[in-house]
Structure formats: structure tokens, C-alpha cells
Amino acid sequence: MRLLFFLLITLLFAACSSTPKVHQPKHSSKTEKDLGIGLSPTPPPNERIPGEKSRAMLMEMEGREIPVRIPDANASKIDKNVSNPISIMSSSGGLLTLWALKPRNWVWGYTPIDSFEFGRAKFWRIISFSNGQVIIKNMQEGTCLQAYGNGVIHDICDSKNQAQLWNLNFFDNQAIQIQSVSAKTCLQTPTVRTTTYYSIYLTKCATSSNLDQQWYITPVALEPEPIFFIK
């Protein structure tokens, strides 16, 4: 937990003065189906707000030795254009996470300590295409990040759906700005939260120094694999 705290502090200081190299689109499409969930992120009415359970689970693990998992040589191969499992973390430490697991629900941000009970719902894979665009696929549900209204939802993956395609614009410090191909806007989350969760919005892409559109691709939070093995 101490290492995680120092990592977040390091990311925050590194983020302060970076400027993104924004992809400049030629045109945009504004048509999208009304899903009946409103246009801005709204907490799911029938879902408990996580946090306390996650913290209790972590307290129980305090002092335990976590076993190292050796990769299975017989495991199915991953396509070259598909990343290893990752976490996507904001500059303020919020991980992109599925709260309500049913497709076509909003995607949220939770800190590692508050999202432990979500399991693999906070882990993703990035699928890259030859034109530089990507799809961001959730590890637990197999659904994909999709631009919708003023925020982002997760839905059944469809590589032909422009709302599920993203450009990753790099800041000088190698953080990324996540830009929707269809909406031409970028993922943003407040740097200060007043609730357990962070709301994730789509807003005009910043072209100058900022914090709230900076995201970091990291090893899966709290369950990292070793970088290499020594026999």
C-alpha cells in the first residue's frame, strides 16, 4: 500500500506541466441512439456504493504473502495487436471501473483501495489497429468502452462502431489523452472528488497543460505480474 501511495504522488507531480499532442479530426458524427440513461453519468440506482468492503478485504490481507503466479506456457496466445491486462488511471488516482456490469451502463473511476472488491471489472486490454486507433476492452465483462452523451459507457464490442474507437494522444510526460473518434472529445475526470467514485466525462480536448485529461496505462492495480523471471 505504501508503494501504491508513492506511485500516485509521483504521477501527480509528473503530470503538472504536460501538453498533449491532440489528434486533429477531419469530420465528426453526432448521431447516437438514446439508451434511456440520460446524457451525463448518473450512479446506478440499484447498486451499492463500494468502498468499505474493499478496505476491509485489504485489511484482512495485511501481512499475508502474495504468491507469485508463473505464466502458463500452455495458455492461449494473445494476438500481437492486443495488450496484456492493464489498469487505466487518472492523474488523481481513479481507475476506470465498471460499477453496474450490465452493458450500456456508465463507466466510473475508483481508487485502487476502494475498487478492490470489483475484481477484474477494473482491468482492461487495449486492441490496436493499423491506423493508430484503439478499442478498450474490459477484462471481466468483455464489453468495450464507448462514447455516449457527456460520458462513457460499456457495451458489446463492435470494431465498426465509431463510438468505441479511440485515439491515444501522448503528453510530454508520456501520460495519454483518450480521444473519442466519433465525438472528437476527450475523457476527463475531476482532480478532486467529493464522493467515493469519480464521474467520467467527455469534454473538449485540452491543447494546453492540464491534469484532468491525463491518464496512465499501468500494470493491473494490486495484482501486478512480475516483469521477468530468474530460473
Curated annotation (Swiss-Prot):
Pfam families: CDtoxinA (PF03498). GO terms for cellular component: cell outer membrane. The keyword Signal applies. Residues 20-51 are annotated as: Disordered. CDTs are cytotoxins which induce cell distension, growth arrest in G2/M phase, nucleus swelling, and chromatin fragmentation in HeLa cells. Its main location: membrane. The keyword Membrane applies. The gene is cdtA. Heterotrimer of 3 subunits, CdtA, CdtB and CdtC. It is found in: Cell outer membrane. Keywords: Cell outer membrane, Lectin, Lipoprotein, Membrane, Palmitate, Signal, Toxin, Virulence. A lipid is attached at residue 16 (S-diacylglycerol cysteine). Residues 130-217 form the Ricin B-type lectin domain. It comes from the Bacteria. GO terms for molecular function: carbohydrate binding; toxin activity. Residues 99-110 are annotated as: Mediates binding to target cells. This is Cytolethal distending toxin subunit A. It is a lipid-anchor. Residues 1-15 form the signal peptide.
